[in-house]
Design a protein with these regions (language model features):
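N-terminal secretory signal peptides and thylakoid transit peptides that target proteins
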Residues: 2-20
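Conserved PLP cofactor-binding pocket of PLP-dependent enzymes
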Residues: 276-279, 323-325, 338, 364-426
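Short, conserved charged micro-motifs
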Residues: 355-362, 436-441
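C-terminal segment of N-terminal export signals and the immediately downstream linker at the start
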Residues: 27-91, 97, 107
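Active-site region of PLP-dependent enzymes
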Residues: 221-227, 231-346, 381
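Phosphate-binding glycine-rich loop
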Residues: 91, 96-138, 152-154, 162, ...
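PLP-dependent aminotransferase-like
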Residues: 54, 129-218, 225
């Protein structure tokens, strides 16, 4: 809530209330079957009002409020849970719901080895462990991401190396990834931020040239497509999150998957305390317990069939917003490759500071007052700027591999100027499949209204 600290009471109520009203989430079970499967013509935009900004007492551009989603579960989940309660086990190994999740997941993301787990963070840790990351090994990834992306690297005593990002894609810049490769580099974690596919051809080429493992962090990218191919199928290992805010959910959970014979057979062991249950072997790897239970799997199995409609609708609405704001001077829309499908876990545009007579904070507050569900930036600062990185205090205030001379990484000296600029100029807008074209058009009008008012 740090972005609200300097607000008046009225501004806080307007901004924070609207942001919570437009909460992340998946399509409600009640409306799942009626969700549109085809693109309908968008209503025409109305003229931009010349009246005073709402924050200065003028009328709101978004006058009808932010569309909500309602409950995101219902009869399909209830049926799966009732059937699950007739089983003799709630354990994942051999559990019918877990097997059903694997089958339905492969219809979305056709990978040979699929393992359910307790979270997206767990999925990423399993992937890093299966990739063989160990003390001092470097893994290149994004500085703008959830800490879950790097927790597994650190627990394996690896070293996160943060590369620069694309100006408006907010994804890894392949050229900078190439520059940061050293003899210690062992893997790349490509974060598809907000559901926008990374440049996977370029990253895969780099990985192949340097014999690196390419891990896809698909936590925010359920249903996204890269050049027509499902996200998760291009790299060596794919990781998904089922946390409550994601496109589909079981409250918390994850899936890690691969078709690569070097890694796929090990995913189950690294998520199940090292047990190789299929072959009944002893503990020949050290691992933690990241298992998903059958009740969680029952909910996931019920939600997976709705994913395509959710993803398609988010893509449609996000692309509509881009179309309507791309002409506004000083506004940088969320950049998506024309052959890709971004599934907009959120939408983020940037403002050009020199184009406006206001700060990003003032622009954001004015936009929120117009009735738009929005927030400033994404995370407060790049991961390397967080205190735990600045102090190298990952394990009880210490970083063993640095103490033993296995890395010279010093995060106090690390800088990614473009990533820092993204967070300093970005404004995040809520997008979900329960929204209407009319609302998105009103959001675009509000952005243009604020931009015109503050134009330099």
């Amino acid at each position: 809530m740090s972005q609200f600290q300097n607000w008046s009471r009225r501004e806080f109520v307007v901004g924070s209330g609207l942001w919570m009203a437009g909460a992340f989430g998946g399509v409600s079970a009640q409306t799942a079957e009626s969700a549109p499967s085809e693109t309908k013509p968008a209503p025409e935009s109305k003229p931009i009002p010349k009246s005073e900004l709402a924050i200065h007492g003028g009328p709101k551009t978004v006058s009808k409020g932010v569309p909500g989603l309602g409950r995101r579960w219902g009869d399909p989940e209830r049926q799966q849970l009732e059937e699950m309660l007739q089983q003799d086990t709630l354990f994942y190994w051999g559990g019918p719901r877990t097997q059903l999740v694997k089958e339905r997941f492969r219809q979305v993301c056709p990978l040979k080895y699929v393992h359910t787990c307790s979270s997206g963070t767990a999925a990423l840790h399993i992937a890093v462990a299966a990739a063989g990351i160990g003390p001092g090994d470097e893994v290149i990834t994004s500085p703008i991401t959830d800490p879950g992306t790097v927790i597994g690297i650190l627990y394996q005593q690896g070293v996160p190396v943060f590369a620069e990002l694309g100006r408006s894609t907010y994804n890894l810049d392949p050229e900078d990834v190439q520059r940061r490769i050293t003899p210690k580099t062992k893997a790349i974690i490509a974060v598809h931020l907000a559901g926008n596919p990374c440049d996977m051809d370029a990253l895969k080429k780099i990985a192949d040239e340097h014999n690196l493992v390419l891990i896809e962090d698909c936590a925010q990218a359920w249903g996204a497509k890269y050049r027509g191919r499902p996200i998760g199928t291009i790299g060596h290992i794919a990781c998904f999150s089922l946390q409550n805010s994601k496109h589909i959910t079981c409250g918390d959970g994850g899936i890690v998957a691969s078709s690569d014979e070097r890694f796929g057979p090990n995913l189950q062991r690294f998520g199940d305390k090292g047990y190789d249950r299929a072959r009944g072997l002893g503990l020949d790897v050290f691992a933690t317990n990241y298992r998903m239970s059958e009740p969680q799997a029952a909910v996931v199995a019920a939600q997976l069939p709705r994913l395509e409609k959710i993803a398609a609708r988010r893509a449609e609405l996000g692309n509509l917003l881009t179309e309507k704001i791309r002409h506004i001077p000083g506004i940088l829309p969320h950049q998506v490759h024309p052959e890709d499908r971004c599934v907009y876990w959120f939408y983020m545009f940037r403002i050009e500071p020199k184009a406006f007579r206001c700060s990003r904070g003032e622009f954001f507050k004015a936009l929120a007052a117009e009735g738009v569900s929005c927030a400033s930036g994404y995370i407060g600062k790049p991961l390397y700027g967080e205190p735990v990185f600045q102090k190298h205090a990952f394990f009880a205030g210490r970083w063993p591999i640095k103490e033993f001379g296995l890395t010279t990484m010093d995060y106090t000296k690390h800088k990614n100027p473009e990533a820092e600029a993204i967070l300093a100029t970005g404004i995040r807008v809520t997008i979900h499949e329960g929204m209407t074209e009319e609302y998105i058009l009103a959001v675009a009008q509000a952005i243009e209204k604020v931009a015109r008012h503050y134009a330099a």
